[in-house]
Design a protein with these regions (language model features):
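C-terminal nucleotide
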Residues: 1-63, 88, 92-124, 220-381, ...
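A short glycine/serine-rich beta->alpha loop
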Residues: 53-54, 70-77, 116-124, 154-162, ...
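Glycine/serine-rich anion-binding loops at beta->alpha junctions
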Residues: 59-75, 155-172, 376-394
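Phosphate-handling active-site elements
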Residues: 140-148, 176-192, 397-410
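Beta-strand segments within the central parallel beta-sheet cores of soluble alpha/beta enzyme folds
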Residues: 100-102, 147-154, 184-195, 334-339, ...
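Structural signature of FAD isoalloxazine-binding scaffolds in flavoprotein oxidoreductases
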Residues: 76-96, 215
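Fold-level recognition of mixed alpha/beta catalytic cores in primary-metabolism enzymes, strongest
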Residues: 160-248, 430
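Glycine- and acidic-rich phosphate- and metal-coordinating loops
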Residues: 135-157
Length: 430
């Protein structure tokens, strides 16, 4: 194992170029940026924890949701792809029983005393709760984990719908898994992260984000049994045809104050399920749902019913999207992407907050996307939890410059990201 200084020298000399190219692509421009980025992270580690420490460096990708908007928590299907935007973590094991994590862009150094296993007062919704919950998740599986010191630098946009939280969680989990020789597989790590987010952080999330960051590639998941979802990996290579670029636009409004809006989607879907004898919509007979619409409207209200309609139709679309990608039929996939986007807007109603109609960044981004991309073979939709954050578009290369310029005119320079899908999940890089 090398020291932080030795790794910086090796990176600058190009000795880790092959490992970086496998994650980010092999162009000299890309490699130069990643050499600089990794070197800076190692320098920051030394600043906070001192020089001369033996370290390992990890990468945890963000994800873009490709299908299955708000279906996973109802025990439906999900489809997502890992992307080249990621979190990089430099870590070194310690023997004092504390986990210390300093994250770029945040002033606070998280210090977790591992003798305090229970959720701590005032810690929920903060990164410290995730770290504590992940450590406890390992212990619940019989893993004897201890302390480490880490510095993280994330390019995954916070509150953007690219799942910065899952990347952070998976980075922490991979550090513990590697430094303490736990040997847990990627799905097990993802479940630990979900446990931490649900129980310690206090967010009722599904599992798709963590699974995609853990496994990489394009991931199709069946959550009929959410404790043991069936997953199928579609290799990222060839998913996007030649001449098509994945663009993600940050509308620069955060998800961070929207937990109540997200929770309402789940609670309303589950209210409909309860009227039909189930806990979630995945347990409900769809034919009976359509037959009992008048009663459901009366008992649950129209928005809840519309969100349930979205679930059933989106679930079927997600299965069709998987089949289209597996068959290499991007045109069919793109048509389904558009339908998914319209359903999120019209039925799930998670493109803007009804209580704040003056602020509709996602709506504006989708409208401009439609004006540019309609009839071109491209596609566009909102992604993630919704209400704010990012939209996703598949843009023909000939239109990328025009498309990005239009997005930047609305949301400012640097808002439009050109992404690639990433084959690797969360890994130790060096």
């Amino acid at each position: 194992m090398a020291t932080s200084r030795q790794l910086r020298e090796q990176i600058a000399a190009g000795r880790w170029d092959a490992a970086l190219a496998a994650l980010y692509g092999g162009s000299e421009e890309v490699l130069a940026r990643q050499r600089s980025r990794y070197g800076a992270a190692l320098e920051q580690f030394e600043l906070y924890y001192g020089p001369g420490r033996q370290v390992q460096v990890y990468s945890a990708p963000g994800r873009t949701e490709l299908g299955g908007n708000h279906t996973d928590h109802q025990h439906g299907y999900g489809l997502a792809g890992a992307v080249t935007l990621d979190l990089v973590a430099v870590a070194s094991r310690n023997e004092d029983g504390f986990i210390r994590v300093k994250s770029r862009g945040f002033n606070k150094l998280d210090v977790i005393d591992l003798t305090e296993a229970e959720p701590q007062q005032g810690e929920s919704t903060h990164s410290a709760s995730l770290i504590r919950g992940i450590a406890e998740g390992f212990r619940a599986k019989g893993c004897d984990v201890g302390g480490f010191d880490a510095y993280t630098a994330s390019d995954v946009l916070r509150g953007s719908g690219l799942s910065s939280s899952a990347a952070f969680e998976m980075g922490v989990a991979m550090i513990l898994n590697t430094e303490y020789g736990c040997g847990l597989d990627a799905p097990a790590l993802a479940r630990i992260c979900q446990f931490a987010e649900n129980t310690y952080f206090g967010k009722p999330s599904g599992l798709l984000d963590q699974l995609t960051s853990a496994v990489g590639g394009v991931l199709f998941a069946d959550f009929a049994d959410p404790t043991a979802p069936k997953i199928e990996k579609i290799h990222a290579d060839g998913v996007l045809p030649e001449g098509m670029t994945l663009c993600v636009t940050d509308t620069r409004a955060s998800h961070s104050e929207l937990t109540g809006e997200f929770a309402a989607i789940r609670s309303e879907m589950e209210a409909v399920a309860a009227c039909l004898g189930g806990k979630v919509l995945g347990e409900v007979d769809e034919k009976r749902f359509w037959q009992e619409l008048p009663r459901l409207r009366e008992q649950c209200g129209d928005r809840a019913v519309l969100r349930a309609i979205h679930y059933f139709e989106e679930n079927a679309r997600t299965l069709a999207q998987r089949d289209a990608l597996a068959a290499g039929d991007f045109a069919a996939f793109a048509r389904l992407v558009e339908k998914s986007g319209h359903s999120s807007f019209e039925c799930c109603q998670n493109v803007y907050c009804a209580s704040s109609p003056k602020h509709q960044g996602l709506s504006a981004a989708l409208a401009i996307s439609q004006s540019i991309l309609a009839g071109t073979g491209g596609a566009w939709r909102m992604q993630g939890g919704g209400f704010a954050g990012t939209i996703q578009a598949f843009v023909p290369d000939a239109l990328v410059k025009r498309y990005c310029a239009a997005m930047e005119a609305l949301f400012g320079p640097g808002c439009c990201y050109l992404l690639s899908l990433r084959e690797q999940g969360t890994v130790r890089v060096m």
